[in-house]
Swiss-Prot record:
It comes from the Eukaryota. Its cofactor is a divalent metal cation. This is 3',5'-cyclic-AMP phosphodiesterase, isoforms N/G. InterPro entries: HD/PDEase_dom (IPR003607), PDE4_UCR (IPR040844), PDEase (IPR023088), PDEase_catalytic_dom (IPR002073), PDEase_catalytic_dom_sf (IPR036971), PDEase_CS (IPR023174). The record marks N806 as: Binds AMP, but not cAMP. It is an enzyme of class 3 (hydrolase). Belongs to the cyclic nucleotide phosphodiesterase family. PDE4 subfamily. Pfam families: PDE4_UCR, PDEase_I. Residues 35-50 have a biased composition (Basic and acidic residues). Hydrolyzes the second messenger cAMP, which is a key regulator of many important physiological processes. Vital for female fertility. Required for learning/memory. 3',5'-cyclic AMP binds at H645, N646, S647, L648, H649, D686, D803, Q854. Pathway: Purine metabolism; 3',5'-cyclic AMP degradation; AMP from 3',5'-cyclic AMP: step 1/1. Residues 174-199, 920-937 have a biased composition (Acidic residues). The gene is dnc. The lineage of its organism: Eukaryota, Metazoa, Ecdysozoa, Arthropoda, Hexapoda.
Length: 983
C-alpha cells in the first residue's frame, strides 16, 4: 500500500499541472486562412482530438528568452530537425504546409521556412493582441503556434499525419484544453513545459503503443559523425542533430520519423524547424520521479527493439528479438559531403577511356542540394541523375505542376544550366525553351543507350565494374609503355586484381572446323607434355579430405587450469604486452612488438583481447576457455615459415578490422553477431596459406585448384580449414548459438572471406561506389542498410580495406610489410624458376622494382578503395587517407631516375656509340675525317670508343645480377651493347 501511494504521489509530482502566471505576454498564432469560422471548426473538433500539436517558441529579437527550461541543465541546446512534410495518401486527405519566409514584424526576425511540392503559397495570417498568463515567469516573449487545417485533423488516421502528431523535439500543447481556449483570451493558460517532461510523455506514449501504425514503418537509426550526435530516420532521411549526446531513451523517444512525416513514406519535401532552449536564472524547475522515467525509458527501448526491422537475416526477413538476430538498433549510414583532395583515376573523364559516345557520362555532379559538389562516376547513378534532370526539364517545358503524390522534390538543376531561372515558366517560341528541349532529348537518348547495354543476368553494379576495368586497363597500358618495369607492374595488377572472367564467343570455340589448327595444337601439346609433367605438383592427399588440417595437440591447445592468461597467452613479458594491447583501438599499432612479446602468438592475444573488450564472449555466449582453445589451434595452422601470410598478418588484419568497426559513422549500426562474424572472418581469412598465389596453384594444377575449380582457391581452402577446426573437441566457440543464428553467421563469414580474393577487388569497389552514389543521387543521403545484401556489402569492403591497410599505416610499419611481401613473392619466383614455369610478375628477384610497384599499387588499387571507404564514413577516414598519400609520395621520391644517377656520365656516350656503329654514320664520320686530313687520329678515336663500349657493357652485365631497385631496364639495354660493338 505504501509503495502504491508513493508511485501515485510521484506521478502527481511529475504531471505538468497548469499553473497561473502573472505576467502576460504577446502571443502570435499562425492560422490557415478561413477566418473565425475556420477557427470555430477547430474548436468544435478539439474535444475529439487527443493528439498534441507542435508549436515553436522563439525568443524576442534574437535574445536568449525561453518559455520552458530543462531540468538539471544550464547549457544552451540547439536542435535542428529536417523531416518530410506533405505528400499524403491518394485520397488527398490533409493539406501540405507550404510557404516561404514569413516575417511577422520588421523588428522581430522570426521566420518559418518550409518547402513543399505544392505550388500555392501558404495562407497564414497574423493574430495579435493575444496574451497568456505566464505566472511567475519573469519575461515576456512571443511564440508561434502551428495549427493544421481541419481536414487534416479529421483525417488523423490517414497517411498525411504531418503536423497533427506528437513532436518529441518541440514543445507541445495540452491535449484537451487547447481547442477550447480563445486565442484572444488573456486568462488562457500556458501549456508549455520543459523538454524532459515532454520526453517523459513521449516515452509513455511509445510504451502504450500509441501511433503504432506509423511507428511500425520506421526503423530507428543512430549514427554519430564528427563531433555531434546524429539521429537519422531510415524511412525518410531526416536528421536530428543535437549539441551534445543524449541518453539512449531520450533519443529513442525522439525518433521523429513518423511524428512529422506522412506514414506512406512518399513525401521527400524537407521542412526545417529550429528550436532553442535556454535556461533562465530565476525559473522554477519542474520535478518528476526519476524512477518512473527510468522504467518508461526501459519500456521504450524494448519497444523500439521489437519494432526494428530484421536486417541481417539470411532470408532478408524480419529479425527476432534476441541481440544475436539480425535486428540492429540502427540500420543506416548518413552520407556526408566530401572535402576537396586528390582524386583517383576513377574520376577522370570517360571520353579519355571509352571510344563509344554512348558510354560517355553526361552528368559529372549530383543534382542534389545536400551533395551538389560531389562527383558521380558509376553509370547507374549517372542514369538516375539524367532521368531526374529529364523529369525536371519536362516540368519546365510543359508547365505541369508537380503532383503531391510524388516523393521526389522539385529540382530545377537543368533549367538553371540552361540559363533560365528555377521555376520560371517557358514559352514555346523562346530560345531557352528550344535549348532545354534539345538537352532533354539528349539526356533521354543517353539513358536509353546505357540501359540497352545492361544484360539481364548482371546487376547494375556490373556496369560500374566493367567501366572501372576498362579505365584501369587504359591506365595500365600507358603505365606499361613508360618502361619495362612498368609493364611488369601492369601485368601484376591485371593478373592479381582483375577477375579473369570474360565473355566468350561460342562459335569461335569450335576448333574442329580448322584442321590445321587442330594439328598445330596437337603438336604443341606433345612438346609441352614433358614440361607440364615437370611443373605439375606432386600428388597430395585424397580430395575427400581437407588438406592442411593437423591432428589436435591437447597439451598445447587446451587450458586445464582454472586461471586463464590475462591476454590469452602465457608470456614472461605480460606487462609490456598489456601496454601495447591497451592501444588496440589505435590505427597503426606496433603489431611486430606484439608478436615478439606474445611469444609468437599475436593472433591469439589480439583476438582474445578484442572479444573481451567488446564483450562478445558474453553476448555471443562463447566460453573463454573454448575460445582460447580454438584460437591456439587456428594459429597453429598458420604457416610460420611464410614471410608475409602468417599469423602476424592475420592479427594485423583483425586489429585493423576492429578499428574500422569503431568508426563513429558505424557506431550502433551492426549487431554483436555481425561484429563478431566480421572479426572471426578476419582471424581465419588466411589460415593454412601456402605462401603461393591462386594463379600459381591454378597454373600448376594443384589439388586445391582441382577441388575448387580454379575459383577463389585459397579463400575456399581457408574457410574449409577454419570450419573444420571448429569440429575439434573443445574448439566449437559457437556451440551455444541457435541453429538459425549459426547459419546466419556461417553465411556471413563465408561471404566476407571470399571477398578477400584480390581478383574480386574491382567488383567490390564498384558495388560499394554504386550503392553510395545511388543514395546521394536519390537525394536522401542515407544508406538504410535494411537488408542482408547491403549490410554484408559494407562488411565485405571493411575487411577488404583491413586486408589492404598496410600502405595506410605509418611508414616504418609499411616498409617492413613491403619487405616481407616481396620476399614471399621472390620465394614463389624461385620455385617457378626451378619448375621451369613462367615467372609471375613481381616474383623475379633479379628484375623487381619495389618502389615503382608500390606507387602503382597505391594509385590503381589502394587509393580508389580507401577513397570510396572514406566517402562512406566521412570524415572518419581522412587521417588514413593523409597517411596513404604521404607514403605514396615517399615511394615516389625513392624511384631511381631514368637513367640512374650512377650512369649519368656514361649514358650520353652509350647513346652516341649506338649511332656510331651504324654503317651510314661511320662512313660519314670517316669521310669528314679524311677531308680534314686527320685519318689516323680518327681511327684511334674509333678504337677507343669501341673499347669503352665493351667495358660499359661488361660492367652493366655484371651489375644486373643484383636485386630490385629499378635496374631491370638498364641491364636489358646493356646486354645488347656488345653485339653492336662487335659489328
Amino acid at each position: 500500500m505504501i509503495a502504491t501511494l508513493f508511485i501515485i504521489f510521484a506521478f502527481i509530482r511529475a504531471f505538468p499541472w497548469s499553473r497561473k502566471r502573472g505576467r502576460p505576454a504577446l502571443a502570435l498564432t499562425l492560422m490557415p486562412e478561413g477566418g473565425e469560422d475556420h477557427r470555430g471548426d477547430l474548436n468544435q473538433k478539439g474535444e475529439n482530438n487527443n493528439r498534441p500539436r507542435p508549436s515553436i517558441s522563439l525568443a524576442n529579437n534574437g535574445e536568449a528568452m525561453a518559455p520552458r527550461t530543462r531540468r538539471k541543465s544550464s547549457k544552451f541546446h540547439e536542435v535542428t530537425f529536417s523531416g518530410s512534410v506533405g505528400g499524403g495518401d491518394s485520397d488527398g486527405g490533409g493539406e501540405a504546409i507550404n510557404g516561404g519566409n514569413l516575417d511577422v514584424s520588421p523588428s522581430k526576425r522570426h521566420s518559418l521556412s518550409t518547402t513543399t511540392s505544392n505550388s500555392s503559397s501558404a495562407p497564414y495570417r497574423y493574430l495579435s493582441g493575444s496574451s497568456r498568463s505566464r505566472g511567475s515567469r519573469g519575461d515576456c516573449h512571443e511564440y508561434y503556434q502551428l495549427q493544421q487545417h481541419s481536414s487534416s485533423l479529421s483525417n488523423g488516421n490517414r497517411g498525411n499525419r504531418g503536423l497533427s502528431q506528437r513532436s518529441d523535439t518541440m514543445a507541445t500543447e495540452a491535449e484537451g484544453e487547447e481547442f477550447d481556449v480563445d486565442p484572444m483570451d488573456e486568462d488562457d493558460e500556458d501549456q508549455t513545459y520543459d523538454r524532459e517532461t515532454e520526453e517523459f510523455y513521449s516515452n509513455i506514449q511509445d510504451a502504450a503503443g500509441t501511433g503504432s501504425s506509423s511507428r511500425s514503418k520506421r526503423s530507428s537509426l543512430f549514427s554519430r559523425s564528427d563531433s555531434s550526435a546524429t539521429t537519422t530516420s531510415s524511412s525518410g532521411g531526416g536528421t536530428f542533430t543535437g549539441g551534445k549526446r543524449r541518453s539512449a531513451a531520450s533519443i529513442l523517444s525522439s525518433s521523429m520519423c513518423s511524428d512529422l512525416m506522412t506514414s506512406d513514406r512518399r513525401s521527400s519535401t524537407a521542412t526545417e524547424y529550429s528550436v532553442k532552449s535556454v535556461t533562465t536564472g530565476n525559473t522554477s524547475q519542474r520535478r518528476s520521479s526519476g524512477r518512473i522515467r527510468r522504467y518508461v525509458s526501459r519500456m521504450t527501448i524494448a519497444g523500439a527493439r521489437r519494432r526494428t526491422t530484421g536486417s541481417f537475416d539470411v532470408e532478408n526477413g524480419q529479425g527476432a528479438r534476441s541481440p544475436l538476430e539480425g535486428g540492429s538498433p540502427s540500420a543506416g549510414l548518413v552520407l556526408q559531403n566530401l572535402p576537396q583532395r586528390r582524386e583517383s583515376f576513377l574520376y577522370r573523364s570517360d571520353s579519355d577511356f571509352e571510344m563509344s559516345p554512348k558510354s560517355m557520362s553526361r552528368n559529372s555532379s549530383i543534382a542534389s542540394e545536400s551533395h551538389g559538389e560531389d562527383l558521380i562516376v558509376t553509370p547507374f547513378a549517372q542514369i538516375l541523375a539524367s532521368l531526374r534532370s529529364v523529369r525536371n526539364n519536362l516540368l519546365s517545358l510543359t508547365n505541369v505542376p508537380a503532383s503531391n503524390k510524388s516523393r521526389r522534390p522539385n529540382q530545377s538543376s537543368s533549367a538553371s544550366r540552361s540559363g533560365n531561372p528555377p521555376g520560371a515558366p517557358l514559352s514555346q517560341g523562346e530560345e531557352a525553351y528550344t535549348r532545354l528541349a534539345t538537352d532533354t532529348i539528349e539526356e533521354l537518348d543517353w539513358c536509353l543507350d546505357q540501359l540497352e547495354t545492361i544484360q539481364t543476368h548482371r546487376s547494375v553494379s556490373d556496369m560500374a565494374s566493367l567501366k572501372f576495368k576498362r579505365m584501369l586497363n587504359k591506365e595500365l597500358s600507358h603505365f606499361s609503355e613508360s618502361s619495362r618495369s612498368g609493364n611488369q607492374i601492369s601485368e601484376y595488377i591485371c593478373s592479381t586484381f582483375l577477375d579473369k572472367q570474360q565473355e566468350f564467343d561460342l562459335p569461335s570455340l569450335r576448333v574442329e572446323d580448322n584442321p590445321e589448327l587442330v594439328a598445330a595444337n596437337a603438336a604443341a601439346g606433345q612438346q609441352s607434355a614433358g614440361q607440364y609433367a615437370r611443373s605439375r605438383s606432386p600428388r597430395g592427399p585424397p580430395m575427400s579430405q581437407i588438406s592442411g588440417v593437423k591432428r589436435p595437440l591437447s597439451h598445447t591447445n587446451s587450458f586445464t587450469g582454472e586461471r586463464l592468461p590475462t591476454f590469452g597467452v602465457e608470456t614472461p613479458r605480460e606487462n609490456e604486452l598489456g601496454t601495447l594491447l591497451g592501444e588496440l583501438d589505435t590505427w597503426g599499432i606496433q603489431i611486430f612488438s606484439i608478436g615478439e612479446f606474445s611469444v609468437n602468438r599475436p593472433l591469439t592475444c589480439v583476438a582474445y583481447t578484442i572479444f573481451q573488450s567488446r564483450e562478445l564472449l558474453t553476448s555471443l555466449m562463447i566460453p573463454p576457455k573454448t575460445f582460447l582453445n580454438f584460437m591456439s589451434t587456428l594459429e597453429d595452422h598458420y604457416v610460420k615459415d611464410n614471410p608475409f601470410h602468417n599469423s602476424l598478418h592475420a592479427a594485423d588484419v583483425t586489429q585493423s578490422t576492429n578499428v574500422l568497426l569503431n568508426t563513429p559513422a558505424l557506431e550502433g549500426v551492426f549487431t554483436p553477431l555481425e561484429v563478431g562474424g566480421a572479426l572471426f572472418a578476419a582471424c581465419i581469412h588466411d589460415v593454412d596459406h601456402p605462401g603461393l598465389t591462386n594463379q600459381f596453384l591454378v597454373n600448376s594444377s594443384s589439388e586445391l585448384a582441382l577441388m575448387y575449380n580454379d575459383e577463389s582457391v585459397l579463400e575456399n581452402h581457408h574457410l574449409a580449414v577454419a570450419f573444420k577446426l571448429l569440429q575439434n573437441q573443445g574448439c566449437d566457440i559457437f556451440c551455444n548459438m541457435q541453429k538459425k543464428q549459426r547459419q546466419t553467421l556461417r553465411k556471413m563469414v563465408i561471404d566476407i572471406v571470399l571477398s578477400t580474393d584480390m581478383s574480386k577487388h574491382m567488383s567490390l569497389l564498384a558495388d560499394l561506389k554504386t550503392m553510395v552514389e545511388t543514395k546521394k543521387v536519390a537525394g536522401s543521403g542515407v544508406l538504410l542498410l535494411d537488408n542482408y545484401t547491403d549490410r554484408i556489402q559494407v562488411l565485405e569492403n571493411l575487411v577488404h580495406c583491413a586486408d589492404l591497410s598496410n600502405p595506410t599505416k605509418p611508414l616504418p610499419l609499411y616498409k617492413r610489410w613491403v619487405a616481407l611481401l616481396m620476399e614471399e613473392f621472390f620465394l614463389q619466383g624461385d620455385k617457378e624458376r626451378e619448375s621451369g614455369m613462367d615467372i609471375s610478375p613481381m616474383c623475379d628477384r633479379h628484375n623487381a622494382t619495389i618502389e615503382k610497384s608500390q606507387v602503382g599499387f597505391i594509385d590503381y588499387i589502394v587509393h580508389p578503395l580507401w577513397e570510396t571507404w572514406a566517402d562512406l564514413v566521412h570524415p572518419d577516414a581522412q587521417d588514413i587517407l593523409d597517411t596513404l598519400e604521404e607514403n605514396r609520395d615517399y615511394y615516389q621520391s625513392m624511384i631511381p631516375p631514368s637513367p640512374p644517377p650512377s650512369g649519368v656520365d656514361e649514358n650520353p656516350q652509350e647513346d652516341r656509340i649506338r649511332f656510331q656503329v651504324t654503317l651510314e654514320e661511320s662512313d660519314q664520320e670517316n669521310l669528314a675525317e679524311l677531308e680534314e686530313g686527320d685519318e689516323s687520329g680518327g681511327e684511334s678515336t674509333t678504337t677507343g670508343t669501341t673499347g669503352t663500349t665493351a667495358a660499359s657493357a661488361l660492367s652493366g652485365a655484371g651489375g644486373g645480377g643484383g636485386g630490385g631497385g629499378g635496374m631491370a631496364p638498364r641491364t636489358g639495354g646493356c646486354q645488347n651493347q656488345p653485339q653492336h660493338g662487335g659489328m
